[in-house]
Every structure is written in C-alpha cells, then in structure tokens.
C-alpha cells in the first residue's frame, strides 16, 4: 500500500486538542472525479475534462479498493464499470510524480445520479464521543465533523453492530449528509488501529 499510517500515542485530552488546533492536518485520501478510461484490468485513467478543485486527471490503480453505489453504499461489481462511466475515487495520499499523476485507490463510488450530493470519504484522526454525538477530526482537514446519535451507522461487509463509539481514530468512513450538511448515514469500514486518542465526555 502507498499509505503509511502510524499509531498515535495516547496523550491528555487538552494536549490533543491543542495539537489539533496548531498542527496542520495530516494528509488523507484525495478525492478525484471524472470519466473512466480503462488502461488495463486493474488501472484506469480518471479525467474530469476540466481544471477544478479536484484536479484534472489521475491514473488510478484499483487494487483492493471497494467499488460502491453512491446512493445505497452497496458493493458494485467492478466488471460493470465501463469506459465513459463517471465515478468519484479517493486515492493516496501518496502520489507517483508522473504526468498524469498515479496513485492507488482507497475507495471508488459510482452509479451517481445527476446533481446528487456524493457521500464523502474520511479517515478519522481523533474523536470526542458523547451520548448525543461524535465530533471527529479527519485527515486532510482542520474542520470537524459532528455525527449525531440519530445518524444511521452501518458496518461495511459485516453484520456487526456499530455505534458512535466505533468512530475512533484509524477508522475510515463514508458519510451521507442532508441538505444542511448534517451527517445522516455513515458506512464504517473495518480497521485494526491501536494506540488511538479518544476524548470522553468527562475528559
């Protein structure tokens, strides 16, 4: 894998919050969108056709990346992804310095309806969990995401029960939000993270 994740040592809550405020956000997977042109059975060119905030074109190595339906979150068969189809792909953060750049996918989302608000993919770096919500810091951003207790949490490919307490550092999540930007559905991917920071309600 091109992504190297180091375990974070447990430190006091106040110190963790100060570090989050002062330190630049750790790089996370980068989002690209566009249409697909297959190069071989495991690699495609993803080209948005224009310069924008998500970049222009990137060569995506699929590897073991899940391919999911943008609306339902259900797994799709990668063999159904054809040239000309539009997808979002989260890659990296490591990029090969080539033209176009190359990277390995973490997640691919397809079957995107027109004008649909595509769910967003994050890696959690720290969490503050209460009975009412989970406030998350995520890689690649200094902003926080607040997941309310009312949000529907679902595990990826398992029948385990997941709760707000499972939104811990190291977890990767796919988040669908309502028109106000409040998360209403969260798909939680399996992880095996140790030495994480979790700030409890009582400190």
Residue ranges and their predicted role:
Residues 60, 67, 136:
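Short aromatic-centered micro-motifs
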Residues 58-62, 147:
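Short, flexible domain-boundary/linker segments around small modular repeats
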Residues 1-9:
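Bacterial N-terminal signal peptides
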């Amino acid at each position: 894998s091109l992504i190297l994740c180091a375990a974070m040592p447990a430190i006091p809550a106040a110190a963790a919050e100060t570090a989050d405020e002062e330190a630049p956000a750790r790089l996370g997977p980068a989002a690209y969108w566009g249409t697909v042109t297959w190069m071989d059975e495991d690699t495609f060119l993803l080209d948005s056709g224009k310069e924008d905030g998500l970049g222009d074109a990137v060569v995506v190595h699929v590897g073991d990346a899940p391919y999911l339906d943008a609306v339902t979150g259900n797994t799709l068969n990668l063999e159904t992804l054809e040239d000309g189809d539009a997808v979002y792909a989260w890659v990296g953060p490591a990029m090969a310095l080539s033209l176009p750049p190359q990277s390995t996918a973490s997640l691919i989302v397809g079957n995107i309806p027109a004008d649909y608000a595509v769910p967003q993919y994050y890696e959690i770096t720290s969490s503050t969990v209460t009975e009412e919500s989970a406030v998350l810091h995520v890689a690649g951003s200094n902003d926080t995401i607040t997941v309310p207790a009312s949000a529907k949490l679902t595990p990826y490919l398992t029948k385990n029960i997941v709760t707000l307490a499972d939104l811990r550092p190291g977890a990767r999540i796919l988040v669908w939000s309502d028109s106000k930007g409040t998360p209403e559905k969260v798909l939680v991917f399996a992880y095996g993270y140790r030495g994480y920071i979790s700030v409890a309600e009582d400190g």
